[in-house]
């Protein structure tokens, strides 16, 4: 009997359309590694998607027809293309990684703002869910699909009895993937018995996540078997999500609904067009009561009990699609008959508008122009402070500040920064001998060649702190060091312990604390600093310190709790307005926050922040520098650095190290000098180690792997090479970050023994032989005179994993209070003399001391 073709026209399925989008991404020019070009393509494609949505909305009678199907299909494909490029491709680019790590790169910062805008558009788009629903309802269903036997709409709840039938009923209704949305510890103790079950902790994801984020972030420490199950999620007939459904676990219930919505509407990597997603009614509580024989505890997961995931084999998520060469055009792919997954569809063309190349819109360039003004906090939409669970305690809150205009009027009259008395380069540089005769007359020419077109230079002496606090400002400086022994806790504003521990440690820095308490920091604000926030971050930080001082100075007890704690709402909002990483309630790395805060304060107080960037060294100047002793070359580089970065933060916290590459064939070297505020040192993978061992590991000669070998300018090719890091400048206050997490977020919980008094003299570059020859000049020492002994005054501690851990702090508050322990709202004096020496140490704070 001849086959009778159906008269009805069907939509292509979600999986078919997703395949088209993936094919376009891999075959049509998106193999570029230029982040700006890819962002331009995304903006253009998103504009096309919006045009299709407008056409869909303009249809007065949405009667199923080929033309209507074309609109919905094209809209979905456009959206999918943007999501694949933005969420899959761009995060893998080296340029993206550099932009995220380099806060000084203005272009990178602008690209990240555009990228974040695109992510925000994707996540908050309220039309794609309806488009997917329409496509699913009007695409041909697989007659053998088992999930059609259950007449429950995806996203709804099913009772425990139905789930049991699905898992073990005689009808074998289909395959089920269970998703347990509870803390890993609860999951280990007891969960539903099934070989296809995974645990996604409720704290591991947020509203802006997609299915890609779940795989790459939320499940980064999950067992291999669970990661494999999640990767095959689209092969299951049903996904059933459950949590501990009770009044005490409202947050988990909210996260459960969030996860279901994510799987249904934001599954960009694996389209769940044939998989239904359900919620287990009553949660695990009802299941365990009804089917106690169908519950089981996990064995062999003790690695999660103490947060030590160093033994786990964490996986890199595979790319959605392989990289291919360009061979097709977009309109060819969409308009022609397509054989997708073995299903041949009758040809029908997409709207003619799509037959041309993706159109460009002028808005992309506008994003660059408008992004530079986005750093002003008062120009951003307001945020609602996070709700706190304890309603019985009223915490003192940092007050809201005046508007920006009011603040500018209230500032003391500042003389123009460019009018500051500046010494000429020739006077700023005085003789330090060069040990190699070939470089004996090179310093002047080197400075000339290296030059900054800067109209100003920093003074020869650093900003004074130790001799007289009065030089910091013209205010009434009544806060004496003896009065800095205040202590108060900070309320956790939703996983903000990473912020609290750093604030407590930084307040142990007496010079910094004094400067903000007496308001002398205002005399250093540079309103024209290119990367600053016009003093807004500094103001919020000062307000918080004042509030903590006010509520902490009168405490006569040896401890404090939530009744005396301060809630840092306004400061947290300010930080989130400047850096979106700190905007929501997700856990962050405390050392990254420390770096952000110090960088932000530096830029606000940067006296040279509006100077033009430094010019790169010429090849001749670089060769001259390589011939100099590292002691001299680093001093020259530091003086160059100060022409664009000069602030009290630099004087208090910043140091410098040299990273030197050397060709093992011809012995040529290339040295770069890098300033730092937080010095990250590796932790050896041994049973125990000392802090000195960490510095030894940090400064040892490293033989580079073949793919990392240096392209030697003399040999004109990649050669076997080594890398050596040398500390060339040690700051007044040294912040040391113990690198306990590797690139896969495995944590090294090795106990690092750190001393109360640390001697780093042996690690400081001291290759200058003090031979003075003609035409040599001497650079200001700026405190770089050995020995370098440091006194410990703060420890930020981390317990658990990077995604699900907790931060606390130990701080030496001076002679009156001594060492104190801080855990959010609670604080107390230490209970034993060596309590602050702990295995959980993560960031160490040292202050330089001088022998009397």
UniProtKB/Swiss-Prot annotation:
<keyword id="KW-0833">Ubl conjugation pathway</keyword>
<dbReference type="GO" id="GO:0006508">
    <property type="term" value="P:proteolysis"/>
</dbReference>
<dbReference type="GO" id="GO:0005935">
    <property type="term" value="C:cellular bud neck"/>
</dbReference>
<dbReference type="Pfam" id="PF00443">
    <property type="entry name" value="UCH"/>
</dbReference>
<dbReference type="InterPro" id="IPR001763">
    <property type="entry name" value="Rhodanese-like_dom"/>
</dbReference>
<feature type="active site" description="Nucleophile">
    <location>
        <position position="497"/>
    </location>
</feature>
<feature type="active site" description="Proton acceptor">
    <location>
        <position position="806"/>
    </location>
</feature>
<keyword id="KW-0967">Endosome</keyword>
<dbReference type="Pfam" id="PF00581">
    <property type="entry name" value="Rhodanese"/>
</dbReference>
<dbReference type="InterPro" id="IPR001394">
    <property type="entry name" value="Peptidase_C19_UCH"/>
</dbReference>
<keyword id="KW-0645">Protease</keyword>
<dbReference type="GO" id="GO:0031902">
    <property type="term" value="C:late endosome membrane"/>
</dbReference>
<feature type="domain" description="USP">
    <location>
        <begin position="488"/>
        <end position="849"/>
    </location>
</feature>
<dbReference type="GO" id="GO:0016579">
    <property type="term" value="P:protein deubiquitination"/>
</dbReference>
<keyword id="KW-0963">Cytoplasm</keyword>
<feature type="region of interest" description="Disordered">
    <location>
        <begin position="369"/>
        <end position="393"/>
    </location>
</feature>
<dbReference type="InterPro" id="IPR018200">
    <property type="entry name" value="USP_CS"/>
</dbReference>
<dbReference type="GO" id="GO:0000131">
    <property type="term" value="C:incipient cellular bud site"/>
</dbReference>
<dbReference type="InterPro" id="IPR028889">
    <property type="entry name" value="USP_dom"/>
</dbReference>
<comment type="function">
    <text>Ubiquitin thioesterase that acts at the late endosome/prevacuolar compartment to recover ubiquitin from ubiquitinated membrane proteins en route to the vacuole. Also removes ubiquitin from soluble proteins targeted to proteasomes. Is essential to maintain a normal level of free ubiquitin. Required for promoting coordination of DNA replication and avoids DNA overreplication.</text>
</comment>
<feature type="domain" description="Rhodanese">
    <location>
        <begin position="172"/>
        <end position="296"/>
    </location>
</feature>
<dbReference type="InterPro" id="IPR038765">
    <property type="entry name" value="Papain-like_cys_pep_sf"/>
</dbReference>
<dbReference type="InterPro" id="IPR050185">
    <property type="entry name" value="Ub_carboxyl-term_hydrolase"/>
</dbReference>
<dbReference type="GO" id="GO:0004843">
    <property type="term" value="F:cysteine-type deubiquitinase activity"/>
</dbReference>
<keyword id="KW-0378">Hydrolase</keyword>
<dbReference type="InterPro" id="IPR036873">
    <property type="entry name" value="Rhodanese-like_dom_sf"/>
</dbReference>
<keyword id="KW-0472">Membrane</keyword>
<comment type="similarity">
    <text>Belongs to the peptidase C19 family.</text>
</comment>
<keyword id="KW-0788">Thiol protease</keyword>
<protein>
    <recommendedName>
        <fullName>Ubiquitin carboxyl-terminal hydrolase 4</fullName>
        <ecNumber>3.4.19.12</ecNumber>
    </recommendedName>
</protein>
């Amino acid at each position: 009997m001849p086959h009778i073709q159906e008269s009805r026209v069907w939509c292509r399925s979600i999986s078919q359309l997703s395949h088209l989008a993936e094919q376009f991404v891999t075959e049509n020019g998106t193999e570029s590694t230029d982040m700006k070009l890819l962002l331009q393509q995304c903006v253009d494609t998103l504009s096309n998607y919006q045009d299709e949505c407008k056409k869909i909305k303009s249809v007065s009678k949405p009667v199923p027809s080929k033309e209507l199907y074309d609109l919905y299909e094209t809209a979905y494909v456009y959206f999918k293309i943007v999501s694949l490029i933005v969420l899959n491709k761009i995060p893998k680019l080296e340029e993206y990684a550099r932009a995220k790590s380099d806060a000084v790169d203005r272009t990178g910062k602008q690209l990240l703002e555009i990228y974040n805008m695109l992510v925000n558009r994707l996540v908050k788009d309220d039309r794609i869910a309806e488009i997917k629903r329409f496509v699913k309802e009007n695409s041909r269903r697989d007659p053998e699909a088992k999930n059609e036997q259950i007449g429950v709409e995806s996203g709804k709840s099913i009772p425990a009895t139905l789930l049991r039938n699905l898992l073990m009923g005689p009808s074998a209704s289909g395959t089920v993937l269970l998703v347990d949305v509870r803390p890993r510890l609860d999951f280990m103790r007891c969960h539903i018995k099934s070989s296809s079950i995974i645990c996604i902790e409720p704290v591991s994801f947020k509203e802006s996540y997609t299915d890609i984020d779940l795989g790459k972030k939320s499940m980064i420490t999950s067992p291999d078997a669970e990661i494999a199950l999640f990767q095959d999620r689209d092969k299951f007939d049903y996904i059933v999500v459950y949590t501990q459904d009770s009044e005490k676990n409202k947050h988990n219930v909210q996260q459960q609904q969030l996860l279901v919505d994510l799987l249904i509407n934001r599954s960009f990597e694996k389209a769940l067009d044939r998989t239904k997603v359900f919620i287990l009614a009553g949660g695990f509580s009802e299941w365990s009561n009804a089917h106690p024989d169908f519950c089981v505890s996990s064995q062999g997961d003790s690695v999660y009990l103490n947060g030590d995931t160093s033994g786990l084999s964490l996986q890199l998520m595979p790319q959605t699609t392989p990289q291919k060469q360009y061979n097709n055009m977009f309109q060819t792919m969409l308009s022609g008959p397509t054989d997708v997954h073995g299903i041949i569809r009758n040809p029908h063309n997409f709207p003619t508008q799509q037959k041309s190349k993706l159109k460009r819109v002028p808005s992309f360039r506008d994003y660059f122009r408008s992004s530079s003004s986005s750093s002003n906090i008062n120009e951003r939409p307001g945020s609602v402070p996070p709700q706190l669970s304890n309603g019985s305690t009223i915490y003192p809150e940092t007050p809201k500040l005046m508007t920006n205009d009011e603040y500018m009027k209230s500032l003391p009259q500042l003389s123009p920064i460019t009018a500051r008395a500046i010494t000429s380069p020739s006077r700023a540089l005085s003789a330090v001998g060069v040990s190699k005769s070939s470089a004996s007359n090179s310093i002047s020419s080197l400075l000339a060649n290296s030059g900054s077109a800067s109209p100003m230079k920093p003074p020869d002496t650093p900003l004074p702190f130790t001799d007289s606090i009065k030089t910091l400002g013209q205010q009434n400086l009544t806060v004496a060091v003896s009065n800095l022994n205040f202590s108060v806790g900070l309320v956790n504003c939703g996983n903000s312990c990473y912020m609290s521990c750093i604030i407590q440690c930084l307040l142990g820095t007496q010079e910094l604390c004094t400067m903000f308490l007496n308001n002398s920091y205002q005399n250093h604000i540079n309103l024209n600093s290119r990367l600053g926030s016009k003093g807004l971050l500094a103001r919020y930080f000062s307000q918080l310190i004042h509030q903590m001082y006010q509520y902490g100075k009168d405490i006569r007890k040896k401890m404090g709790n939530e009744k005396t704690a301060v809630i840092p709402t306004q400061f947290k909002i300010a930080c989130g307005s400047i850096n979106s990483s700190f905007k929501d309630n997700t856990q962050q790395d405390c050392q990254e926050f420390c770096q952000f805060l110090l960088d932000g304060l530096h830029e606000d107080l940067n006296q040279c922040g509006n100077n033009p960037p430094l010019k790169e060294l010429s090849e001749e100047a670089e060769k001259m520098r390589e011939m100099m002793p590292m002691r001299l070359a680093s001093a020259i580089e530091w003086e160059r650095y100060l022409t664009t970065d000069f602030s009290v933060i630099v004087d208090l916290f910043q140091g410098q190290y040299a990273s030197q590459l050397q060709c093992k064939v011809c012995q040529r070297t290339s040295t770069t000098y890098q300033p730092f505020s937080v010095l990250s040192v590796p932790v050896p993978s041994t049973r125990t180690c000392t802090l000195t061992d960490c510095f030894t590991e940090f400064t040892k000669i490293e033989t580079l792997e073949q793919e990392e070998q240096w392209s030697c300018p003399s040999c004109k090719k990649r050669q076997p090479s080594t890398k050596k890091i040398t500390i060339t400048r040690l700051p007044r206050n040294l912040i040391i970050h113990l690198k306990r997490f590797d690139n896969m977020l495995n944590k090294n919980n090795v106990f690092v023994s750190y001393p109360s008094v640390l001697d780093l003299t042996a690690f400081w570059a001291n290759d200058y032989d003090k031979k003075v020859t003609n035409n040599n000049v001497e650079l200001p020492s700026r405190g770089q005179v050995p020995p370098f002994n440091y006194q410990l005054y703060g420890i930020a501690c981390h317990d658990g994993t990077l995604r699900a851990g907790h931060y606390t702090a130990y701080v030496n508050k001076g002679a009156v209070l001594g060492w104190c322990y801080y855990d959010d709202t609670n604080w107390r004096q230490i209970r034993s003399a060596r309590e602050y020496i702990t295995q959980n140490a993560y960031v160490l704070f040292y202050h330089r001391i001088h022998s009397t």
